[in-house]
Design a protein with these regions (language model features):
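Family-specific signature for flavin-dependent thymidylate synthase
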Residues: 1-199
Length: 199
């Protein structure tokens, strides 16, 4: 188990959410070899370059799904957990039960912000896709804070993946939301887009 723990005080939350980054499954060599298979080449050797990693992540070719991440939120407000379980492609969720017959506590007495343990296992493409929704300023501040903690943990192990975790506007180059937060009209937006696209 990788030791990569972080605590985060969530906006308007009663408890201190904690994240544990458990492990990475798959290697960049495996990603590269899968890519080589698609062009009828034998397996290669060594670690792919940072530039190659960024390029295949931006292209979102299928081999990147061989790289997977496992993490766990602790004391995550239940309603924030519900936001995350809406994501279903390339990710699995394991959420602690609130059933009365399992916990010995009255489920009907629990509030929406009751803390839960929420573990996830997701591939690189799913992590990038979820980032587009959950790093957006239209996402709730609490959900955004929880997802930022995931991206920051990934950045310590796989910085190229974290560099491709951006909000929808940076990914598309414009804001598709009905009500924009205004970020697209700032110099910081142009800088973020340029940084995202740089290989």
């Amino acid at each position: 188990m990788d030791k990569c723990n972080a605590k985060c005080k969530m906006p308007n939350a009663k408890s201190l959410m904690k994240i544990r980054f458990l492990k990475i499954k798959g290697t960049w060599r495996e990603v590269a070899d899968a890519a080589r298979t698609t062009i009828r080449r034998d397996e290669g050797e060594g670690e792919p370059s940072t530039k190659w990693k960024k390029r295949i992540l931006l292209a979102e070719h299928s081999p990147i799904r061989k790289l997977c991440f496992n993490w766990k939120w602790e004391d995550l407000p239940y309603w924030v957990s519900v936001h995350f379980v809406r994501h279903k492609y390339g990710i699995e969720h394991f959420v602690s039960t609130q059933r009365s017959d399992r916990t010995g506590e009255d489920r009907t007495a629990k509030t929406q912000d009751a803390p839960v343990v929420h573990e996830c296992f997701a591939n690189a493409q799913a992590v990038m896709f979820i980032s587009r929704r959950r790093l957006c300023s239209q996402a709730s501040p609490e959900t955004r804070a929880a997802w930022k903690a995931v991206v920051e943990a990934i950045a310590e192990k796989e910085p190229e993946v974290a560099a491709c975790c951006v909000p929808e506007c940076v990914y598309r180059g414009f804001c598709p939301e009905f009500k924009s937060c205004g970020f697209v009209d700032t110099p910081a937006f142009k800088e973020a887009v340029a940084k995202y696209r740089t290989v």
